[in-house]
């Protein structure tokens, strides 16, 4: 399949897939990149420059969300029950275009650029697959996210981490029983737990 700006924009927008079901949309390698599947649906590639240098990681999320798209736009997706509601199609298209440009100009930079098209971002699963495969070691790592509050044509950069993440944690609240006439001697675990939530 020939890679073009039109294909990137339309294919990623019109054919969204959720989490682990991205087998349908192929990330083409028509600009000389060998790609590797990561856990079935993620995609990894490397662009080598003209000599030894730093390793930079560029990452984009590729999943759609399980939300029905209800608009009547011409670019409405073809897959029922899912849509790129969080801009992941634009993230994917941006990384594909970066790959295309860097591939054409690899004789103008040194080092390696690693491309990570990450799956399962919304459930905190996909990144671990790239990490466990040893694919995200490097000197710097960059990712982007669209923001509707930033004017078109502008870019906002923040030092350090600035995106949300999926984190799992468990809290154990231990109570202590007491007689009903001396509640001050006990610990009401239900009250403590509800205070944490609120």
Map each language-model feature to its residues.
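Acidic/His- and Gly-rich active-site-bordering loop/insert found
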Residues: 1-84, 93-109
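Histidine/acidic-residue-rich, glycine-tolerant segments that coordinate divalent metal ions
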Residues: 65-67, 73-83, 90, 107-198
């Amino acid at each position: 399949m020939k890679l073009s700006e039109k294909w990137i924009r339309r294919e990623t927008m019109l054919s969204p897939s959720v989490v682990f079901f991205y087998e349908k949309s192929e990330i083409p390698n028509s600009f000389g990149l060998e790609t590797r599947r990561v856990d079935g649906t993620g995609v990894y590639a490397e662009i080598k420059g003209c000599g030894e240098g730093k390793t930079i990681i560029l990452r984009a999320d590729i999943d759609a969300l399980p939300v029905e798209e209800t608009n009547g736009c011409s670019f409405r997706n073809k897959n029922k029950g899912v849509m790129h509601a969080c801009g992941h199609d634009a993230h994917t298209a941006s990384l594909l275009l970066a790959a295309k440009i860097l591939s054409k100009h690899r004789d103008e930079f040194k080092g390696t650029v690693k491309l990570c098209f990450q799956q399962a971002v919304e459930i905190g699963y996909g990144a671990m697959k790239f990490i466990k495969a040893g694919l995200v070691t490097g000197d710097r790592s960059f990712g982007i996210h669209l923001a509707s509050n930033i004017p078109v044509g502008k870019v906002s950069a923040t030092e350090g981490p600035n995106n949300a993440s999926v984190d799992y944690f468990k809290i154990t609240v231990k109570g202590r029983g007491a007689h009903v006439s001396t509640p001050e001697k006990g610990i009401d675990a239900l009250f403590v737990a509800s205070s944490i939530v609120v």
